[in-house]
Amino acid sequence: MIIFIVFVVLFFLCKDSLLKMMYPKMYKEIVSIYEEKYQVEENLIFAVIKAESNFDAKAVSNRNAIGLMQLMEETAKDVARKNNIELNSDNVRQELEDVYRNIEIGTCYLATLLKRYDSKEVALAAYNAGIGTVDGWIEKGIIKNDGSDIENIPYKETNNYVRKILRDYKIYEVLYP
């Protein structure tokens, strides 16, 4: 019983440190640069990175999304072209493995989605499922542009993705106000 009480006391004394280990702010200097440049909340960027790659800069998904923010090569090329971001189109994969480039393009893309849609929820759905898919859902009345009915997102993966990022975003907000 004493061991349990000691464990509980230690947990409460160290919980912020433990939570910050689970929800780190790795690459903070880089995120800060692009958070300011593209006007995207820092804690939202960290929540996306955590969900997408868990801060593994070399992560590659089964769909070939690359790096910290799990960008598809075609999406990265499109975002770079539309926003005058220099990108070596002959070696996009290598470019996306660079943490600076990945965070810049991912944050720029997130900023574009946040401007396009009326809510974080819908922007995050588009980050995961794609703009065309989300626009189709809105046109068909499946979801609203204001994000008030995210439970109606028809793709289970995207529905869970949006909820996970929103949860992680709130945790980041509490840990790093």
Kindly label every feature range from the protein language model.
Residues 11-177:
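Catalytic glycan-binding domains that act on GlcNAc-containing polysaccharides
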Residues 1-14:
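Hydrophobic membrane-insertion alpha-helices, especially the h-region
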